Amino acid sequence: MTKAPATKKLQRVPSKAIWLFSGSDQLTQASDKTVKSTKSMDKEIVNLKKDLIRSRFLIQCVKIGRGYFTMLQEETAFKKHQQHLKKLQEEELNKFQPAKKYSDIQCRDTLLTTYEYEKMKKLEAGIIIRPFTPIHNCIMAPSLPESHVDPLFRQLCALHWLLEALTIDHTHHTMRPVIACWNPKDPGGSKSTIKKINKDKSMGQRWDHFVTAPKTKKFKAPAIRSLATRKPSRRGSALSLTRTSGGSSPQSSMMSVNPSSDEPTGSKDIEDNESSSTKPEEEVLHFSLQKLLEMVREDARRTILMETEMQKKAPSILSLVKQVKSDYGWKDWQTTHKSSERSSTTSGESHIQVTQKKSKGRANRDIIYCKTGICNTMRAKFYSVAQEAGFCLQDKMEILKKRQEERGLQKFHSFIVTSNFQKDIAKMRHQVSMVKGDAEEMADHWYFDLLSKLPEDLKSFRPAKKILTKLQKFGENLDLRIRPHVLLKVLQDLRIWELCSPDIAVAIEFVREHIIHMPQEDYVNWLQSRVNMPIRHRPILT
């Protein structure tokens, strides 16, 4: 019974606090992210359940007496057939379909020009037009017999930079800018640790601070002040002297008030000149120190304003003392003075308590709202990490499923000579190594297909040899898996002119089509939202 109203208050506070803060959009975004991540996690859990059901089904079939390897061969053949049908369907969608009637062509306002006629011929040939990508000097082309070496070299460098950025651990490493990938000394770019980059930045800032010329100190000449222009007020000087001389004798105070006393007129001028000459020049502070000083000043200003407001709101005791008349005796006046002082202090304390309660209520409301925001952001981060872990698990399971037949054959051949069950199991586990793909898979792989297309002039080019050896580690990994959202996350950090650059656009298209297998419509929609301009369908001819 006692806990019910407390829970109601906690539920009501965030809804009331929304109009007080401008950070409600972040909470909605975090909640949307959590909803999306939970959906994707549910999908991954369903896939995991399907894989477990499939493995149990295979175990039951083997127990009945069916062949394990024959079932795996049937599964791979069915999967290849499905992929072939999907590829044919995509080609049919991208294929040029001419008009059936001549009247449909005549309905256009203008006749086809020669360029449009050539464009239609290319469409009939099955060439897919991609945004910002060249046609002839391009690694996406089916053949490269008469291509130039320089554009192909730049495209290979951008391809290596993109693959490196997609596969590194972004928590500890980061990539250098894309422009650095075309350096002939280090083609393809390289990764670097975040600690090293921060150290280089600090060293650069120190060097700039050391190289910049220091500001010259300007010594101000002491201004000569005449006695006629300077007429200090006697009253102000007397008051200042009486304030400063708190512990002095009454004779000295009387001497300071006396106008006929002799004063050294030039003493103040000398002190002002000395203070102005000995005043040190203000040194140029660091940006972080300036920011810290501004924050401290702002905090001090706020505290002073709060104190002044509290003093204004509290009732003054002196106004009540002035109302007391001297009609009564000294004792009566003393008693009334004490009672009025007590009443005024109690009223002031009650007012201060009310204001403190209001401020505490607002502070508690702010804390509750901040806690809810922190909970939502932490929940979104947790779901994003769980989603990445689910993707990694799914990729590993797909790789194991893909290599299941080869690994099973290797394990089976290790049991040729049997001696002891435990020894045979240990021997089987030691003999299972990294399985290389068959000839058909290697022929269809993007790396070997790219090597077969490249001209001999490029292969003999010395910087191109370096970039091809760097691409070899990605090409020989037949089980390389990259998710589409990872590609979009890396491309989000690029600038617009980098996305529209022909060399980088070719590398992005190559990774999208041959490695990630991302649909072109999804990438074009993302690119239109990123570039914020309609993409023309006319290719860049180089």
From Swiss-Prot:
Matching InterPro entries, A to Z? DUF4698
Q: Which residues form a coiled coil?
A: 70-97
- Annotated region Disordered: the residues are 228-284, 334-358
Sorted keywords for this record are:
Coiled coil
What residue ranges are annotated as transmembrane? none
Question: Biased composition, Low complexity: where in the chain?
Answer: 245-261, 342-351
What name appears for this protein in its UniProt entry?
Answer: Coiled-coil domain-containing protein 60
Q: What is the lineage of its organism?
A: Eukaryota, Metazoa, Chordata, Craniata, Vertebrata
Gene this chain is encoded by: Ccdc60
